[in-house]
Amino acid sequence: MKIYVDAKAARDGNGSKESPFKCINDAAQIAQPGDEILVEPGIYREYVDPRNGGREDARITYRSTQMLGAVITGAEEVKNWKPYQGNVWVCRIDNSIFGSYNPYTTYVYGDWYFAGRSKHTGAVYMNDKMMYEAESLDACIKGEVYECSWEPEASVYKWYSQQEGNETVLYGNFQGKNPNEEKVEINVRRECFMPSKTGVGYITVSGFSINKAATTWAPPAAYQDGMIGPHWSKGWIIEDCEISNSKCAGISLGKYLDPENDHYFTYKHVKSPTQMERDAVCRGQYHGWLKEKVGSHIVRRCNIHNCEQGGIIGRMGGVFSVIEDNHIHHINNMMELGGAEIAGIKMHAAIDVIYRRNYIHHCTMGIWCDWEAQGTRITQNLFHDNQRPEFAKQLKGGMMSQDIFVEVGHGPTLIDNNNLLSDASLRMATEGVAMVHNLICGALTCVGEGTGPRYTPYHIPHRTEVMGFMTILHGDDRFYNNIFVQKWPATPFVTLRDSREGTDEENREVGTHVMDEYPTYEEWITMFDMDTDTPDMAKLETAHGSHLPVWAKGNAYFNGAKAWKKETDNLVDTEHEVQVEITFQDGKPVLATNLYEFLGDFSGSMIHSDTLGCAFEPEERFENPDGSSITFDRDYLGEHRGMRILPGPFADKTDAGKKLW
């Protein structure tokens, strides 16, 4: 059945074509498996709470009849501003409009939040641009540049709120503009399109603009909301949407509300947040965390931008998903929020998740795979400018920047055929990573560090059931057929510590030399007395806690990038100066480089799953989610690799000059 919605209809109807509903949520209350909800262009200021899910063979589809013409927003327009002082105006909002959730009394705060409790989930927007929350009315009046912002010219637009009786009083510094003549909105709803109950699966959301919700901080051991999300269900498709201006997360593929483990550390203090993450994994299994019930979502062809925690986030609920062909950019650029959950994509337990053909730039981090990146594949993506600008001061509690961060996982985590162009390409406080056919212009950081005594789960291959827990031994990493270029300065990068005082230095020298202290497989295996069938447990105790081996072959190094001292069959060019830059043709990114002039006749071998072997702890191959083998015979663009195997993401040197996205 087709159900029709039109915000511009003369009056409420019954959902027929002749008499459409005016609100999407009316359709969401009656839709049954197989139904299609057709939504006409218009502004829908409502929260859509689907009552029913579809089935695998009979999805419920919500479709904007005009691409991005139907806008679902968590905001309301405000036109009762009055002059206050200088460039500052004031308005009063009756708190009844907020119902049980007032964003202007709710702080962005919780587990793993490091930037101090001062920002609200509410926000003021002028002409679709989120304004900056001032710490005081005086700061709002002054309207000074915020020194941590990545967009300083926008940071002078300030707002401030306070409570008086049953009213929220909002002050806004509009820098000489009359807010009653501009499009000024405030967010009032926590979500835009998300079931209030779990298990509402097999829904497609296609072609909508979704924006301006008062979402909350969403760490891994808490309820994780977003402007849109499946809320612990299976089989959603979110496609061809524009997702923007969330206070915290844009799309949540995350965790349900567990009242016994919701910001436990923040509220009770007596157990570490790391312990409660482990508990969340185990409790999740009790609450239905199975391949048959949760995950297997698709997020594709979406434009996700200007969200201040993450573009896509989620703990556990995103397993077995495909995230492809998305443009994710300008995430956390305001630098008002800081903590360990911020990235273009931040997911815990990305089991068998595939991230492919995404374009990710100008984010605090590109993709952050935290815990249980088992069977995860990051392939054919373009990353650049995921680094703090030189003019921006680091936010205390803000995170270090890099294209990819893999943290405290056991693998197999596969990173192949990507262009990694920021100053830090991979932060690897983890083990069990394979990097194959990438262009790597930034450093490998945090090698052998950043894990502490944390012990994390690994799983039955291609399942969610826990197989064991182990600390991170580091190593078990593979580097095949990559190109490393020292594009950025090699001097160490000074960073503020996340939640403690002081600074640290982070590596900015490009190359696999950071693995110099790690053994080859042959060196490692000799520690285990393989020539006896009566091993001595006490004797081997030290070996069982030692670094795992590393493999490297077929890599090329330019501009001073350094090779692992035990690597053979590589190219180290110390003579030529190589340039790698992103340029734009007709608004599309193109790689400008001369590196292929200096490869000469150097080539590598075809890489297969059998080449990479198994990740050590889960004993799972680097393979497809269905268990089939991977042959790396297709490049970044999908072109075929023939008899000559060039290092890097392109099968032929001419492909590097093609449009990348």
Region spans (language model):
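Extracellular polysaccharide-degrading/modifying enzymes targeting complex plant/algal/animal polysaccharides
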Residues: K2-W232, I237-S244, G250-S252, Y256-W289, ...
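Short catalytic-loop micro-motif centered on adjacent basic/acidic residues
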Residues: L38, G229, G311-I313, I367-W368
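Right-handed parallel beta-helix
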Residues: G201-A214, K234-C248, E260-G284, L290-G310, ...
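Predominantly extracellular/luminal carbohydrate-interaction, adhesion, and secreted-enzyme modules
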Residues: G226-I228, G310, A343-G344
